[in-house]
Amino acid sequence: MANKSIYVTMPTLAPLEEVTQLMQGIWERGIMTHNGPLVQRFEKEVADYLHLRNIVSVTNGTIAIHMAIRALGLKGEIITTPFTFIATISSIIWEGCTPVFVDIDPDTLNMDPSKIEEKLTEHTCAILPVHVFGNPCEVEQIDAIAKKHNLRVIYDAAHAVGVNYKGRSIFEYGDISTTSFHATKMLNTAEGGACFSLDDELHEKLKRLRFFGFDDRKDVVDDGTN
């Protein structure tokens, strides 16, 4: 029997002629970066599809987590899961915080909320769960624990584009949700990611962080990225 690769996932590709038409428009406009017309169209269509008003698209899902941590000004220990892609953990470390692992529920593979409080210390600043394989975390329990202990919540929703929980987008929970548009994800742009927040002030800060920290007047007011 000949060896045949079995792929976990494969990207869905648009017809080449459609991509070529979009590329032609980019060449004609000469706008290659920094929130061009196609980025704005993409953000609007994703927001409309998810019934959300705030989206900040970025280069990938990893930088989305970086920006979420930076936007919330987190310092100290972040409760997270050991069952995730390395980018979740490396983002915490790159932002100068310390990951503290809480074990998972063997049935859902998500963080077990009943084990969070035993890991809290005076240095804990946030909880960063992952919706593993698009299966929603126990968001109500996690958000309640965070509120009780005055912690922030970032959900890594890299697998969860389009997921609803009790009639609401899963991106509506926590302070910020991040996602990925990597080629292996449900919605792919080859590379890409986004941050979502219902908090308008956080949304504006995330927009500044995405563009080098510039505000609308082009004054640098935050330590941004690109």
Where do the model's predicted regions map?
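N-terminal "arm"/small-domain region of PLP-dependent enzymes with the aminotransferase-like
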Residues: M1-I31, N226
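Active-site region of PLP-dependent enzymes
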Residues: S5, W27, A160-K166, Y173-N226
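Phosphate-binding glycine-rich loop
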Residues: I31-E77, F83, S91-W94, V100-D103, ...
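PLP-dependent aminotransferase class I/II
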Residues: P37-E45, Y49-R53, S114, E118, ...
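Active-site phosphate/pyrophosphate- and oxyanion-stabilizing loops and adjacent acidic/basic residues
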Residues: K44, H66, E140-D143, E191
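Short, conserved catalytic or interaction motifs in soluble domains
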Residues: N60, I104, V132, A183, ...
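PLP-dependent aminotransferase-like
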Residues: R70-A157, N164
